Amino acid sequence: MAVMNDNKIVVYQVLTRLFGNTNTTNKPWGTIEENGVGKFADFTTKALEELKALGVTHIWFTGVLHHALTTDYTAYGISNDFPAVVKGRAGSPYAIKDYYTVNPDLADDPTQRLEEWEALIARTHQCGLKVIMDIVPNHVARRYESIAKPEGTRGFGEDDDTTVQYAVNNNFYYNPNEAFQLPEGIYGEYHEFPAKWTGNGARASKPDRNDWYETVKLNYGVRPDGTKDFVELPASFENEDTEAHYHFWADKTVPDTWRKFKDIALYWLGKGVDGFRYDMAEMVPVEFWSYLNSAIKHQNPKAFLLAEVYNPNEYRPYLHLGKMDYLYDKVQLYDTLRNIVTHGHSTDAIAPIQHNLADIAHRMLHFLENHDEQRIASPEFAGYAEKAKPAMTVSTFISESPVMLYFGQEVGEKAAEVAGFGSPSRTSIFDYIGVPAHQRWVNNKRFDGGQLSETERSLRNFYQRLLNLKVNGAYIDLHQYNRQHTEYYNDRVYSFARGNEDEQWVIVSNFSEHDHFGFDLQLPDYLLGSWFLNDGTYTLTDALYNEKHTTLQIANGKGRLRVDIAPLESLIFKISKLVDS
């Protein structure tokens, strides 16, 4: 298992093409000329320094790879894509067309697009930040065409036997003698023969419009009947390190797709990328991840590897056998916190999640927003950004795990625009569009928040304070104990402790929009014993704003902490000194 850092990892996901776009036209289905686009160059040293000051340690630059799009770059030797199999005008960042170069939209000079990306990598490193980019292993654009691949490299599908449905070294699955047909309701011109299976696994030559019809499924040596055409890992290898995994695969024959992706990952590591976010990782066999990740760690032991995995039953296999560093904590913590914020569900649901994940909690990435999820401030989620402050506090501090925010989240972006293919409530990843609240922070590329409202400025200040606060030590639930033993403590509040012998923290969040609460929070004797706290009175100060103070009374091994908490407030108390004993 990798130990990634000494401090909290804070990932900032940014849709690269939207970050520096200052155009406010926001015409539905607008072209790049009408609605504008951001560039690599927009990530200036000033912008990067501001992100670092926010508390960010890693930037996930989303949409860097050259994906299918509708803008014409034939003057630069790039073939046009067929609009019928491109979602939106700007295209999906997850329909990769060429893994060895980057999106020409993002370059001031498309002929220098790779060099401009390399310059941004260097600039990011100079500001003390790490660079993460996507790898999308499950599928590629319907018309994959790598014009930038290194000499001697073969592109996906170039050597496939298209007369058979499956062959172990084919990169795609085929329906021989059948032509691809566009889904019902999707119009335009596109020819593909024979038809390939669609990215989400749909096998029909005419997929449904809700299928991932703009992509094709990659073949990892899994036969159509689900059996595997490769060596499986011994179960004991969940306890082996990445070097043991690397040596395991050294003399094994693996499917061609595996080798191609290893070459791709090592290519980008060689360009200075610090790690990868793997799209839909659980749709690819865990053995492949052992093969790929052990090769990556062999080249760069500190590489950051984050996987989008949604099935809790797959968490441990993908961590221990697949050698991921971190996984999304979406269907448990995110979904639970969202239900508390949106629907007023009980906070009693939080503690069991941490209990069930106790052995891997530090490897579950927490977030409240990303490109797939609705914006907090949208009516579909919270309606206004401040309502999720307690959830963000819990998400950030409940464990040592990394936390992620999505650009614009820190200023309350609502994503209310009708962009085109994308719908309001999510910032569109498919369209040329502006991000209004974020643009007010960008302030004509001054990156100083000069156009933010006072409310937006205050929210960003909250995030900056939160993300720069270093809370260490083991997690101990206080909620269940106080639900049983503390008068006036209730399920609109959540409390927990973090700490060790050297530093101790008590964190309380109030999820109620309207109600103040007051109670004497009880700290159980086993907690006080583990912290070696003697009887007496201790002072506590809220470390978030340094304005609220309280005392912890310990007598006969039992502790009581007075808490008076306002609606949507979080108190992060650090136990500092013994007043008397």
Model-assigned labels for residue ranges:
Residues 216-315:
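Active-site neighborhood of glycoside hydrolase catalytic domains
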Residues 37-51, 253-269, 388-392:
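Short, acidic/polar
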Residues 141-151, 286-298, 309-341, 414-421:
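Substrate-binding cleft/loops of secretory-pathway carbohydrate-active enzymes
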Residues 22, 69, 84, 311, ...:
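Loop/helix patches that line or flank the sugar-binding groove of alpha-linked glycan CAZymes
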